[in-house]
């Protein structure tokens, strides 16, 4: 993550290709199949960055805002086909994401999680399973899930 003027354009292209174009390509295939079968439940994984922007995250936040907007739009389009669309918006989750964004720098990646207990991938997975198992008449349309020490995208209470 870097400022807009200092970031590498190749990073932008990778984020846009992955977080928007890749997301749309998969979503289109899945949506078409669900419309054919007349039912389904699409659960998209967005990010707190899709509803809150922050410094040095402009392009990443923009791609996650796109996921959020597409999820909302698709929910409107799919409801008449009997298809639910939900979005899970995780905050700080201890995954390989930090290692990727810091280009393999393990020390820098682990520093992101110092002084607090982040969410684990299993925490997010449990929410997805819960959402998927709700009765058809219930749609948990959007769910922001944060670590207990996190109140906003970049506001984390650290005990160091």
Regions found by a protein language model. Give the residues of each.
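Residue(s) in the substrate-gating loop at a strand-loop-helix junction
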Residues: 47
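C-terminal helical subdomain
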Residues: 87-88, 95, 107-154
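Substrate-binding pocket helix/loop in short-chain dehydrogenase/reductase
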Residues: 2-4, 8-13
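A short helix-coil junction within the Rossmann-fold of NAD(P)-dependent oxidoreductases
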Residues: 2, 29-38
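Active-site loop immediately N-terminal to the catalytic Tyr-X3-Lys motif
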Residues: 5, 54-58
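Alpha-helical segment proximal to the catalytic Tyr-Lys
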Residues: 32, 76-79
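Active-site helix of classical SDR
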Residues: 27, 63
């Amino acid at each position: 993550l870097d400022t807009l003027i200092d970031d590498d354009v190749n990073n932008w292209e990778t984020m846009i290709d992955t977080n928007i174009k890749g997301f749309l390509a998969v979503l289109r295939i899945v949506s078409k199949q669900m419309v054919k079968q007349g039912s389904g439940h699409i659960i998209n994984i967005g990010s707190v960055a899709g509803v809150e922007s922050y410094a040095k995250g402009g392009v990443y936040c923009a791609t996650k805002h796109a996921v959020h907007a597409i999820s909302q739009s698709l929910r409107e389009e799919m409801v008449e086909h009997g298809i639910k669309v939900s979005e899970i918006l995780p905050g700080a989750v201890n995954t390989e994401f930090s290692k990727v964004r810091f280009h393999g720098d393990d020390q820098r990646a682990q520093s992101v999680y110092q002084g607090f207990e982040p969410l684990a991938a299993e925490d997010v997975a449990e929410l997805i399973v819960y959402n998927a198992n709700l009765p058809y008449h219930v749609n948990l349309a959007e769910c922001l899930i944060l670590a207990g020490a996190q109140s906003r995208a970049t506001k984390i209470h650290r005990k160091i």
